[in-house]
């Protein structure tokens, strides 16, 4: 691939991003994780590590430093650049799916510092490789220093066990009530580091190692060439280890360091023995094999190298992280969980099914599901105390999308319980209840109620009295019903199919009758029946979502469809559409919390990448292949009109938003937030609606909507238990057309591709006028 920016480039078919300088615009981090552990590794090796279970605890907060000292000359340097900011002769940081490696050369010593998180356990493994590139023997001292954060210093104790070589830190929660003591006993947390080669000296005290509180200067221990030893009590703990290494010319030395947390020193010893028996290489291979399986579910080859890299590699990683770690939070909305699982279904349908079912168990017998929830069993707080009304619609949209991937009608008959009830019902019945609830919770204009907010949950002013109505909720329900009806028909449930059709028509008619403002659809009606999101509003006139979802749901047609598209295009920037225009400049009680958000950020007028994918989806529905692809490509941090050097972000994940005020010097800056609903929708929209390799209730269908100047593209996709290699040709230079399909060299006329478990199909598709 071509170099994407002055700071780095993709290589190995997009599987690696190479950063060529330690001096990036921001902390350009990779994130490595398993189901219970997460760490961030910047281009200089810095970042936090978090253990999720038994409860979230942060360790190694603040710094991870490595120092090398030449014992003959006294020369010292930092192979990670920080903290001494030693200028290396050569430097590169290689971020990949499961690892980060930082290579540098200083004073004729080539160093490689490599880190990964094994598939199981709460630990990370660091490997230091030193090579003497000179012609003289070298005697070096290697110092490693990890800040072992463990819940405060007032009750902390850090010590080194000479026999096991385990340096560990433990801190019992200092401010704990009498009644909380037993619970704390059950959640003890010991943070540790240990080497595979014995340490020559160690430090447990941050002050002792650095010689004071300045952690950015050359440490006192490094100056002396040796750590002082001794334990630390009621002070900042540190895991510092020193080893002497001698190297002949051309010789290489390898040292491993394991950092993690456990419930006791005995558990660490046991884990250490298991790791030694298994071997570091085996653990690394397991990690690489896992990612090979995840990335192998589908592969695209289009004329757009950047989109290829994200679709084939980085979006898959991001969606796995968000789903498997629950976005690293116990405080989250079910809409996030469900939309993450929607994307996850494209790489692990079975895992996505279990995740969605765990969310579905939160649905009440009425059909309602609370939007913001605490997943750790703690009492509700903040947004969890509010009633956002869009939860049920996401159950339908995301679970039907999952069912399309799985093709398992038996899953619809699986019994799932309800929150606060001993009752259970089939998944199909759960979805019908969700539709019935939403359709029954309507206001004076026949639209779905707003409550404390819809998808745009900081709009909590208009519906706070219980009468406000949401145009978006209504459009989304129409879309959801259309997604559910094919499963009603598949099950032979014509009665519910007809009833749902009637509801969808009624709601669509209400939107077109009440919500059209002459040039676009309004956002809704407040508790007093006054429309908002209209041309008469000074701020918040035009909302992207009600235009895109009017198209996605089929509510907008004819001239209104054209006007919706024109309104959408008026919101465009070089990196995607703004979520609304104009943004709010200050508190407005009519609108609520959204007006308190900084203009140009998040929901208040940013280029909100999640909503940008709704726009790309709508473009595909409208047959605008070039516009859809442009939006997808512009949303990536590799966008040449807003490159990493300008947006400031490492280009291995899509952010939550880009700053949206055109007259601000921060226009286009990335939020750097790795948690976003963009990921699932970009995967789904790109694969199934732009490239058109679409899973349906009746099988895999082909319906591309691409840039007209594309001559061809290829998609390899595992679908259910079969594999397809699909080559699409576009000799007429069109965005959308009829498709002429051959399967294994034979003409294929059916609407869906053939399916037989275990088969591999070669498919050729030609777009025709």
Swiss-Prot record:
Catalysed reactions listed for this entry: 3-O-beta-D-glucosyl-D-glucuronate + phosphate = aldehydo-D-glucuronate + alpha-D-glucose 1-phosphate; a 3-O-beta-D-glucosyl-beta-D-glucuronoside + phosphate = a beta-D-glucuronoside + alpha-D-glucose 1-phosphate
Keywords for this protein: Carbohydrate metabolism, Cytoplasm, Glycosyltransferase, Transferase
Cellular compartments per GO CC: cytoplasm
Activity response to pH changes: Optimum pH is 6.9 (for the reverse phosphorolytic activity). Stable between pH 6.6 and 8.8 at 4 degrees Celsius for 24 hours.
Subunit structure as annotated in this protein's UniProt entry: Homodimer.
PANTHER family attached to this UniProt entry: CELLOBIONIC ACID PHOSPHORYLASE (PTHR37469:SF2), CELLOBIONIC ACID PHOSPHORYLASE-RELATED (PTHR37469)
Task performed by this protein: Glycoside phosphorylase that catalyzes the reversible phosphorolysis of 3-O-beta-D-glucosyl-D-glucuronate into D-glucuronic acid and alpha-D-glucose 1-phosphate. Cannot phosphorolyze cellobionic acid and laminaribiose. In the reverse direction, using alpha-D-glucose 1-phosphate as a donor substrate, the enzyme acts on D-glucuronate and its artificial derivative p-nitrophenyl-beta-D-glucuronide. The apparent catalytic efficiency towards p-nitrophenyl-beta-D-glucuronide is approximately 5-fold higher than that towards D-glucuronic acid.
Name used for this protein in its record: 3-O-beta-D-glucopyranosyl-beta-D-glucuronide phosphorylase
Originating species: Paenibacillus borealis
């Amino acid at each position: 691939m071509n170099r994407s920016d002055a700071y780095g480039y993709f290589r190995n078919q997009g599987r690696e991003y190479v950063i060529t300088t330690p001096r990036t615009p921001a902390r350009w981090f990779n994130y490595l994780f398993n189901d219970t552990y997460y760490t961030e590794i910047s281009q200089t090796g810095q970042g936090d590590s978090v253990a999720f279970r038994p409860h979230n605890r942060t360790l190694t907060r603040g710094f991870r430093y490595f120092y090398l000292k030449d014992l003959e000359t006294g020369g010292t340097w930092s192979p990670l650049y920080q903290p001494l900011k030693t200028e290396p002769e050569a430097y590169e940081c290689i971020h990949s799916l499961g690892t980060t490696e930082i290579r540098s050369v200083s004073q004729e010593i080539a160093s490689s510092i490599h880190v990964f998180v094994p598939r199981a356990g709460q630990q990370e493994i660091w490997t230091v490789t030193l090579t003497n590139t000179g012609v003289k023997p070298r005697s070096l001292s290697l110092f490693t220093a990890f800040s072992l954060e463990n819940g405060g210093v007032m009750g902390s104790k850090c010590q080194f066990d000479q026999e096991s070589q385990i340096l560990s830190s433990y801190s019992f929660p200092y401010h704990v009530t009498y009644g909380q003591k037993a619970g704390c006993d059950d959640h003890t947390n010991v943070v540790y580091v240990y080497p595979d080669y014995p340490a020559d000296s160690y430090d447990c005290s941050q002050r002792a190692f650095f010689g004071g509180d300045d952690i950015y200067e050359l440490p006192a221990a490094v100056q002396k060439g040796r750590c002082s030893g001794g334990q630390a009590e009621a002070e900042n703990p540190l895991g510092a280890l020193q080893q002497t290494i001698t190297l002949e010319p051309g010789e290489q030395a390898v040292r491993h360091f394991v950092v993690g947390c456990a419930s006791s020193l005995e558990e660490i010893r046991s884990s250490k023995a298991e790791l030694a028996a298994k071997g570091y290489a085996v653990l690394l291979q397991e990690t690489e094999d896992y990612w090979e399986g995840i990335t192998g579910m589908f592969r695209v080859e289009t004329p757009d190298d950047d989109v290829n890299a994200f679709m084939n590699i980085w979006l898959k990683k991001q969606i796995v992280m968000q789903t498997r770690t629950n976005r690293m939070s116990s405080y989250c909305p079910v809409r996030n969980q469900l939309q993450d699982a929607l994307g996850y279904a494209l790489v692990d349908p079975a895992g996505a099914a279990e995740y969605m079912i765990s969310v579905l168990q939160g649905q009440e017998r009425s059909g309602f599901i609370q939007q913001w929830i605490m997943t750790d069993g703690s009492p509700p707080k903040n947004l969890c105390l509010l009633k956002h009304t869009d939860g049920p619609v996401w159950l339908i949209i995301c679970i039907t999308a999952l069912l399309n991937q799985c093709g398992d009608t038996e899953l619809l008959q699986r019994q799932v319980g309800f929150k606060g009830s001993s009752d259970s019902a089939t998944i199909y019945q759960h979805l019908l209840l969700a539709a019935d609830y939403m359709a029954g919770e309507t206001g004076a204009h026949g639209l779905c109620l707003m409550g404390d907010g819809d998808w745009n949950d900081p709009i909590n002013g208009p519906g706070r009295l219980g009468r406000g109505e949401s145009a978006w909720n209504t459009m989304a329900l129409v879309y959801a019903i259309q997604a559910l009806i094919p499963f009603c028909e598949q099950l032979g449930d014509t009665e519910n199919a007809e009833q749902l059709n009637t509801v969808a028509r009624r709601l669509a008619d209400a939107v077109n009758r009440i919500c059209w403002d002459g040039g676009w659809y309004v956002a809704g009606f407040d508790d007093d029946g006054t429309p908002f999101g209209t041309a008469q509003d000074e701020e918040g006139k035009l909302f992207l979502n009600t235009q895109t979802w009017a198209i996605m749901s089929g509510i907008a047609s004819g001239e209104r469809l054209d006007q919706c598209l024109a309104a959408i295009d008026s919101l465009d920037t070089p990196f995607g559409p703004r979520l609304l225009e104009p943004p709010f400049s200050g508190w407005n009680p009519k609108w609520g919390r959204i007006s308190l958000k900084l203009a140009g950020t998040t929901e208040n007028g940013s280029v909100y990448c999640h909503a940008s994918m709704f726009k790309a989806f709508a473009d595909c529905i409208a047959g605008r292949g070039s516009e859809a692809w442009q939006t997808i490509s512009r949303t990536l941090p590799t966008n040449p009109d807003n490159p990493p050097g300008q947006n400031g972000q490492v280009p291995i994940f899509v952010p939550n938003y880009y700053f949206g005020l055109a007259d601000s010097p921060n226009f286009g800056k990335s939020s750097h937030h790795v948690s976003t609903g963009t990921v699932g929708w970009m995967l789904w929209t790109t694969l199934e609606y732009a490239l058109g390799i679409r899973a349906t209730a009746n099988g895999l269908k082909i319906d591309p909507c691409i840039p007209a100047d594309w001559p061809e593209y290829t998609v390899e996709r595992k679908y259910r238990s079969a594999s397809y290699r699909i080559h699409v040709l576009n000799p007429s230079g069109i965005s959308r057309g009829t498709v002429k399909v051959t399967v294994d060299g034979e003409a294929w006329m059916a609407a869906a591709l053939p399916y037989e478990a275990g088969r591999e199909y070669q498919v050729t598709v030609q777009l025709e006028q």
